[in-house]
Regions:
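ATP-binding N-terminal substructure of ATP-dependent carboxylate-amine bond-forming enzymes
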Residues: 1-108, 120-134
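Glycine-rich phosphate-binding loop of ATP-grasp-fold ATP-dependent ligases
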Residues: 21, 114-118, 143-169
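Hydrophobic beta-strand scaffold residues
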Residues: 39, 84-85, 113, 144, ...
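Phosphate-binding site of ATP-dependent enzymes
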Residues: 158-187
């Protein structure tokens, strides 16, 4: 085995996926310990940068989920501190965590993806966007998947099997993000 590493395990944070992240962090720490490495748990809160500097890790293992963990934010901080880390770089994270952008990139690359529409809550609440729903329903059909444009762990994902279920599904998705994705369900 190579020399043991000091690994900062970044976990928790302030996203809606905090609980998932804490469980992931515990599993990572256990695995690193079994491999003979020193795991340094760091809850990604208000003192994160100072804690990273003080810990002087050889590498950071990103066990964060959701905003600021998977969206390129923490990766940019680690790069600024010159701390190597697990996972993708900031640009790839930004592309992957924005579901609407990711779908546009897939289409541009010729990768099949179900038909979709994106709506911002401002459009729905203040610009009469709800009037576009019959057209969207006609073009996507039912069942339809309604999900926040950002985030993971299936938080806020709802299925609308018919038109009467769509408003409730949208309210649920909007409780997680200001933008949502309406997508044809593929069985």
């Amino acid at each position: 085995m190579s020399e043991p590493l000091r690994v900062a395990v970044l976990q928790g944070g302030r996203s809606l996926e905090r609980a998932v992240s804490l469980r992931s962090g515990a599993q990572v720490r256990d695995g690193l310990g079994r491999l003979g490495h020193t795991a340094i748990p760091i809850d990604a809160g208000g003192e994160l940068v100072g804690e990273l500097i003080a810990a002087q890790p050889d590498v950071a293992f990103i066990a964060l989920h959701g905003r600021h963990g998977e969206d390129g934010t923490i990766q940019e901080v680690l790069e600024a501190l010159q701390i190597p880390y697990t996972g993708s770089g900031p640009a790839a994270c930004v592309r992957a965590t924005d579901k609407v952008l990711a779908k546009h990139l897939m289409r541009a690359a010729g990768i099949p993806t179900p038909p979709f529409f994106a709506l911002h809550d401002h459009v729905v609440k203040q610009l009469g966007g709800a009037d576009a729903l019959p057209s969207i329903e006609e073009r996507l059909g039912f069942p339809m998947v309604v999900k926040p444009a950002h985030g993971g762990s299936a938080l806020g994902v709802k299925f609308a099997r018919q038109g009467s279920e769509l408003p409730g599904a949208m309210v649920g998705a909007f409780s997680y993000d200001v933008r949502l994705l309406l997508e044809r369900h593929i069985a």
